[in-house]
């Protein structure tokens, strides 16, 4: 079969209504018939992915059978709650707020994270500084493993950044992952208490590039947008009439105390390019053809492909089920 010519519109949904109804019908069947549950639990953060996931759940299961769970902690943006409530009001779902700060303090999440940050910046104190980790490399200009930096920002807005040593990087990430895993546990509490399913919110890039926490936000019973590119998620958001403010909001990690976009933290590319380059890579399009369509050089596309290959391989363990064949 001849491949379609690569263009900037190649991942645009041919029929948004058809795609949406297919997801809704499958989600309804999976939750009620395959899983035998009575409804769905969605963790809502006011972001585009959780908003579309909730909207799809409402269409599939009915608003009376969907509960939106807000799971803030002390580093969360106050905007997240505002947008989450606006979303819930739009789709008529009941919400429950579970502040997980005390849970995270019990795990030592903040203490363990701050210990590692203080080894990099001895002056760091979470009362005086905000912090974040990020990748400062350009995917299109170089092919090398991601190098993370720690940035601290004082009360006057002065920033300092240093490349993270591997020990401190691993400790910061391990400590921060308590957040996603605590949220997953709380979602399953409410799911089991109501005999509901947990509706996961990761999109295609998060699943396939490993931008999720194993047994954290990767823990769910169903993932209705798990095969959708980010721009396709936005297409569904428009179709489902997700509040405009949420659609226009820049996707963030909402994990560290300093503001941080998903592009800055992990993807290293704007979503309009990320989607198209990933499609080209996984469907075997030659770098020169993709580059011509996107006004990039073949070399830039090759760098992106090599990064995708590396991320997909190094995060494969996140997508694996527990290994059982030891007989």
Protein language model regions, located:
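Conserved G/P- and acidic residue-centered "switch" motifs that form tight phosphate/ATP-binding loops
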Residues: 47
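Acidic, Mg2+-coordinating phosphoryl-transfer loop and its flanking beta/alpha structural elements
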Residues: 72
């Amino acid at each position: 079969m001849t491949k379609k010519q690569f263009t900037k519109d190649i991942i645009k949904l041919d029929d948004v209504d058809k795609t949406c109804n297919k997801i809704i019908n499958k989600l309804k069947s999976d939750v009620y018939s395959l899983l035998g549950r009575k409804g769905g639990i969605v963790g809502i953060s006011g972001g585009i992915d959780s908003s579309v996931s909730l909207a799809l759940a409402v269409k599939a299961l009915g608003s009376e059978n969907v509960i939106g769970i807000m799971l803030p902690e002390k580093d969360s943006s106050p905007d997240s709650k505002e947008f989450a409530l606006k979303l819930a009001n739009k789709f008529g779902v009941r919400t429950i707020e579970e502040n997980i700060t005390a849970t995270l303090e019990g795990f030592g999440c903040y203490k363990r994270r701050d210990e590692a940050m203080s080894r990099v910046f001895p002056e760091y104190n979470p009362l005086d500084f905000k912090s974040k980790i990020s990748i400062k490399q350009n995917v299109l200009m170089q092919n090398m493993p991601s190098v993370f930096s720690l940035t601290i920002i004082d009360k006057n807005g002065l920033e300092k950044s240093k490349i993270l040593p591997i020990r401190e990087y691993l400790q910061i990430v391990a400590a921060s992952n308590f957040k996603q895993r605590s949220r997953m546990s709380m979602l399953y509490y409410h799911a089991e208490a109501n005999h509901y399913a947990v509706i996961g919110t990761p999109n295609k890039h998060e699943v396939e590039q490993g931008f999720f926490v194993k047994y954290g936000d990767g823990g769910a019973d169903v993932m209705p947008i798990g095969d959708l590119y980010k721009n396709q998620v936005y297409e569904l958001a428009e179709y489902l009439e997700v509040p405009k403010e949420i659609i226009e909001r820049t996707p963030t990690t909402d994990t560290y105390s300093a503001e941080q976009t998903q592009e800055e933290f992990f993807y290293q590319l704007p979503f309009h390019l990320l989607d198209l380059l990933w499609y080209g890579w996984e469907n075997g399009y030659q770098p020169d053809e993709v580059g011509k369509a996107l006004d990039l050089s073949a070399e830039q596309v090759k760098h992106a492909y090599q990064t995708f290959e590396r991320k997909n391989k190094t995060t494969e363990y996140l997508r694996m089920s527990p290994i059982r064949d030891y007989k």
